């Protein structure tokens, strides 16, 4: 389910966001109006989506983070194909990995999911 189409571009964006979190955001007071923070929102989207579509959603999120917005809980939303039960059972037996994200279906459609980090 991870985005593997353009790993180089995703790695560049992810490294720049992690650098921002480590060197700039760590030294400023916490003032984010949303949960998850805009930088975590960006990292989660880059994990699941192509970098270009993720950057569009990230830009909208950053523009909505202003004094006139009330903020709140706003999880990123992504589109994914639901895996078949047989395929996921085969994958489960072969390569078991720890759960990092929950994908919670939205009420809008069967292919859009909220991304929630465990």
Curated annotation (Swiss-Prot):
Gene Ontology CC, one term? plasma membrane
Which InterPro entries does UniProt cross-reference here?
A: Membr_insert_effic_factor_YidD
Q: Classify the protein's membrane topology as the record does.
A: Peripheral membrane protein
Pfam annotation, one family: YidD
Q: Which UniProt keywords apply?
A: Cell inner membrane, Cell membrane, Membrane
The record's SMART domains line, in alphabetical order, gives: Haemolytic
**Superkingdom of origin:** Bacteria
**What is its subcellular localisation?**
Cell inner membrane
- Write out the transmembrane intervals: none
What NCBIfam families does the database record attribute to this sequence? membrane protein insertion efficiency factor YidD (TIGR00278)
What functional role does this protein have? Could be involved in insertion of integral membrane proteins into the membrane.
Q: Which family does it belong to?
A: Belongs to the UPF0161 family.
Protein's recorded name? Putative membrane protein insertion efficiency factor
* Organism listed in the record: Helicobacter pylori (strain P12)
Q: What is the lineage of its organism?
A: Bacteria, Pseudomonadati, Campylobacterota, Epsilonproteobacteria, Campylobacterales
């Amino acid at each position: 389910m991870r985005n593997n189409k353009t790993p180089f571009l995703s790695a560049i964006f992810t490294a720049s966001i992690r650098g921002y979190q480590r060197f700039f955001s760590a030294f400023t007071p916490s003032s984010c109006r949303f949960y998850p923070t805009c930088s975590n929102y960006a990292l989660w989207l880059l994990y699941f989506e192509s970098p270009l579509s993720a950057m569009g959603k990230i830009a909208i999120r950053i523009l909505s983070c202003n004094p006139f917005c009330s903020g709140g809980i706003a999880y990123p939303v992504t589109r994914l194909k639901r895996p078949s039960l047989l395929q996921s059972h085969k994958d489960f037996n072969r390569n078991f990995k720890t759960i990092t994200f929950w994908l919670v279906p939205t009420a809008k459609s069967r292919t859009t999911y909220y991304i929630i980090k465990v």
